Amino acid sequence: LSLRGVCATDKLAGNEKISGMAERKSKPGARYMVGVNGDFFYTRGTTSRGVSTVGTPYGSTIVDGVIYRARNNAKEYKNFVVATDGSLYADPFFFSGSIVAADGSQATVGGINTYSGEVPASNVDKVTIYNDLYYGATAEIGAGCEVAAVLVEGEKFETAKPFKMKLVGNPSTAGD
């Protein structure tokens, strides 16, 4: 018997019954039988482009090392954690990070898959990283400057480990 995390629809936002998640994730030798909602989540709302945010967890969410959402300065939110050694605990999850350019200059990372001005974890004047688990587009029209980047071949985007990215686009304030 083991305890595993699941994110509804395997995306940041989305509604899915616990029974649906259990059925979708079960496979021979690993049957999901019991589920509990482990976070508070948005029950309404859309992005500036009209994409639903319903189902988005308020807190930081990491499942099997995959970062769905990481909020900087969100110390008052407790997260239920299943550690890699199987131990369980509930504690605030504080995310922090920085980006170091080839020339050595640095910028603070404000979050992963969060939006600018998100209270209490504001990303103003910080770098936000969006991955393919976000709402399909950043929806941050005019909120900052965006530039597309991809992981360097062989790199993994996972918790508590550095990774390298390569810029593949020009900066833009148009969003997406």
Predicted regions span which residues?
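Gly/Ser/Thr/Pro-rich low-complexity, intrinsically disordered segments
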Residues: 1-176
